[in-house]
């Protein structure tokens, strides 16, 4: 999760986020080189006393400043398109989880398990335990198995919301009357935090998301326990 004075992105816990971080560094390096070149040219223009008042055309320069930007745009576009197609790949997901946005909480439904659904509200500050995070904890964490492809179906019951978990590289709009889907996976166990990322009303800042990734066998035990409790 994010921490004070953080300069970079959150640590990646999914292959998609690792690709996004690599693309971010790639694009940032290109921008740095372009900025350095522009500053260098500006400094030359400010310090040189030579002028070219008689130059009417310079086809070589025009060709360079047309072709070079096109090459740079291609260098940025190709890895971006690759990641875009990766996010749309759905190969036999282990389970399907449906997230429904409300003002101002989330509802979750495990489509592969009978009667396994719950609401997830923010934990009030006065109920927080030592070590828990203000405005990020919920009363019911969303538990998922690690190292498994999970299909998320995201919608809304009232207004526009957005389901986002930065460390997984996942962000999808929750739109009333429409289902959006994304694929997510975690390569390690742990707690991962997110929030609603679409302004949805006065309590928009109080819609946290907490995903708890655990081992396969522990997840099956957890799902069986909730099913027994719901009977």
UniProtKB/Swiss-Prot annotation:
Record key words, sorted: Copper, Electron transport, Magnesium, Membrane, Metal-binding, Mitochondrion, Mitochondrion inner membrane, Respiratory chain, Translocase, Transmembrane, Transmembrane helix, Transport
Residues binding Cu cation A1: 161, 196, 200, 207
NCBIfam families recorded: CoxB (TIGR02866)
InterPro entries in the cross-refs: CcO_II, CcO_II-like_C, CcO_II_C, Copper_CuA, Cupredoxin, Cyt_c_oxidase_su2, Cyt_c_oxidase_su2_TM_dom, Cyt_c_oxidase_su2_TM_sf
Catalytic activity entry: 4 Fe(II)-[cytochrome c] + O2 + 8 H(+)(in) = 4 Fe(III)-[cytochrome c] + 2 H2O + 4 H(+)(out)
Family, per entry: Belongs to the cytochrome c oxidase subunit 2 family.
Recorded name of the encoding gene: MT-CO2
Protein's recorded name: Cytochrome c oxidase subunit 2
PROSITE patterns reported for this sequence: COX2 (PS00078), COX2_CUA (PS50857), COX2_TM (PS50999)
Segments traversing the membrane: 15-45, 60-87
Cofactor: Cu cation
Keyword Lipid metabolism: no
Record-level Gene Ontology MF annotations: copper ion binding; cytochrome-c oxidase activity
Residues exposed to the Mitochondrial intermembrane side: 1-14, 88-231
Biological role: Component of the cytochrome c oxidase, the last enzyme in the mitochondrial electron transport chain which drives oxidative phosphorylation. The respiratory chain contains 3 multisubunit complexes succinate dehydrogenase (complex II, CII), ubiquinol-cytochrome c oxidoreductase (cytochrome b-c1 complex, complex III, CIII) and cytochrome c oxidase (complex IV, CIV), that cooperate to transfer electrons derived from NADH and succinate to molecular oxygen, creating an electrochemical gradient over the inner membrane that drives transmembrane transport and the ATP synthase.
Binding-site list for Mg(2+): 198
Cell compartment(s), UniProt: Mitochondrion inner membrane
Membrane topology type: Multi-pass membrane protein
Main location group: mitochondrion
Description of how the protein assembles with itself and partners: Component of the cytochrome c oxidase (complex IV, CIV), a multisubunit enzyme composed of 14 subunits. The complex is composed of a catalytic core of 3 subunits MT-CO1, MT-CO2 and MT-CO3, encoded in the mitochondrial DNA, and 11 supernumerary subunits COX4I, COX5A, COX5B, COX6A, COX6B, COX6C, COX7A, COX7B, COX7C, COX8 and NDUFA4, which are encoded in the nuclear genome.
Protein residues bound to Cu cation A2: 196, 198, 200, 204
């Amino acid at each position: 999760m994010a921490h004070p004075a953080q300069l970079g992105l959150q640590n990646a816990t999914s292959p998609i986020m690792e690709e996004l971080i690599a693309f971010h560094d790639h694009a940032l390096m290109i921008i740095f080189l372009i900025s350095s070149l522009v500053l260098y040219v500006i400094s030359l223009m400010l310090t040189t006393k030579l002028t070219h008042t008689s130059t009417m055309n310079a086809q070589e320069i025009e060709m360079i400043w047309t072709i070079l930007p096109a090459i740079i745009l291609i260098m940025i576009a190709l890895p971006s398109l690759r990641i875009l197609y990766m996010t749309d790949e759905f190969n036999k997901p282990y389970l399907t989880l449906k997230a429904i946005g409300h003002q101002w909480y989330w509802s979750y439904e495990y489509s592969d398990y009978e009667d396994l659904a719950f609401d997830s509200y923010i934990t009030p500050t006065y109920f927080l335990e030592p070590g828990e995070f203000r405005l990020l904890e919920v009363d019911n964490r969303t538990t998922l198995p690690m190292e498994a492809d999970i299909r998320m179906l995201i919608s809304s019951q009232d207004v526009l919301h957005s389901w986002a978990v930065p460390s997984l590289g996942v962000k999808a709009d929750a739109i009333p009357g429409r289902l959006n889907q994304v694929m997510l996976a975690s390569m390690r166990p742990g707690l991962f935090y997110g929030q609603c990322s679409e302004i949805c009303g006065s309590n928009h800042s109080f819609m946290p998301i907490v995903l708890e990734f655990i081992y396969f066998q522990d997840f099956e035990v957890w799902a069986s326990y909730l099913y027994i409790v719901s009977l």
